[in-house]
Curated annotation (Swiss-Prot):
Belongs to the cytochrome c oxidase bacterial subunit CtaF family. Associates with subunits I, II and III to form cytochrome c oxidase. The 4 subunit cytochrome c oxidase forms a supercomplex with cytochrome bc1. It comes from Corynebacterium glutamicum (strain ATCC 13032 / DSM 20300 / JCM 1318 / BCRC 11384 / CCUG 27702 / LMG 3730 / NBRC 12168 / NCIMB 10025 / NRRL B-2784 / 534). This is Cytochrome c oxidase polypeptide 4. The lineage of its organism: Bacteria, Bacillati, Actinomycetota, Actinomycetes, Mycobacteriales. It is found in: Cell membrane. Pfam families: Cyt_c_ox_IV. Its EC number is 7.1.1.9. Part of cytochrome c oxidase, its function is unknown. GO terms for molecular function: cytochrome-c oxidase activity.
């Protein structure tokens, strides 16, 4: 069995056990202010949480059966075995910083509820996203 599926089966067993304990505990606890019986909100939450982690574990199990041995399942794997290509990074690009400024301007507009700041921030954000995506689509002499 693969490691990701095991990581999800553990919480499933824990939450299912806690749901059973919780249901039996709330059935037999009686204090002066409540009616004796199952406390439904916590019971349903624990059962649904166990079901959701079970679904995720089964999905990961079925998915990982179809793939080859992963580096995290191989005992002699190195960190570099998992590392893939990170992609191209442009260290001289101004557009990520400009985009952050546009997001900040837009956030100030939302916080202070100024419509003109929201509109200008959205226009700046669209402009900087476009320039970031198209910066290598123009020739070098146009930079």
């Amino acid at each position: 069995m693969k490691s990701s599926a095991k990581l999800m089966y553990g919480p499933t067993v824990f939450m299912a056990a806690m749901a059973v304990i919780y249901i039996f505990a709330t059935m037999h606890v009686s204090d002066g202010g409540s009616v004796k019986g199952v406390e439904w909100v916590g019971s349903v939450a624990l059962v649904l949480s166990a079901g959701l982690t079970l679904m995720l574990g089964v999905y990961l199990h079925f998915t990982e059966v179809r793939v080859d041995v992963l580096p995290e399942d191989w005992e002699e794997a190195e960190v570099a075995d998992k590392a893939g290509t990170l992609g191209f990074f442009s260290p001289s690009s101004i557009w990520p910083a400009a985009m952050s400024g546009a997001v900040g301007f837009l956030a100030f507009g939302v916080v202070y509820f100024h419509y003109w700041m929201i509109a200008v921030g959205l226009m700046l954000l669209i402009f900087t996203i476009t320039k970031l995506n198209l910066q290598y689509g123009v020739p070098k002499e146009k930079h």
